[in-house]
Amino acid sequence: MKRYLVPLLAACLLLTAGCAKAPDTAEPSADPAAAASAAPETTAAPRFAAGEETAYILCEGKSDGAKALSIWLRSSGMDAAESFVPDGLDAPMYTLPAAERALGEIPAATDETRHVRVAADTELLESGILAVWLPAFESATGYIAEIYAGDASVLAAEAAAGEADVLLMKKADASALGTMTHYGARYDLVSTIYSVI
């Protein structure tokens, strides 16, 4: 199982974005129009493709950290999801469920409950939404989210063992698992017609 940490991902993105461009050492061309026509036109391939709608749900475990993340994602996290437009798209990626937003009080983080283990579908991680959600959650609540990402089989193993506090997975995959003893509550989270390519 691969372990992905949002802070590591964010640091890699910052390092990549901060790299200086190598100086242009090519000799200047006498005819700028000839140089422009010789250079291939660069177009970035889209990172997302439209297709069938995929719904994601949150499966809440029994810890205070699970409850805290669940309430936060279903309240403040909805604002971030509603306006999330990743590079490669011109419109918000996710639509929200019709359900009302959570109004419960978020349990305070303690030394014993501060770490929240989150097992997430790889596509949620790759879309970039977790890099938006989790740092904001940590900042607002004092909890620390530890991310584990994988496909349906990895999430099924996490669910069976109860190793994660929260599962963020495709609704169809969760339905296939049936009753999960470690995760008593399930909530619709977001849906999208886009998939990461």
Please give the residue ranges for each predicted region.
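Bacterial lipoprotein signal-peptidase II cleavage site
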Residues: 19-27
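N-terminal segment of the mature folded domain
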Residues: 34-51, 106-197
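Periplasmic-binding protein-like
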Residues: 70-94
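Bacterial N-terminal signal peptides
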Residues: 7-16
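A bilobed periplasmic-binding-protein/Venus flytrap-type ligand-binding module shared by bacterial periplasmic
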Residues: 51-65, 72, 195-197
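An extracytoplasmic/periplasmic, membrane-proximal ligand-sensing/linker region
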Residues: 86-113
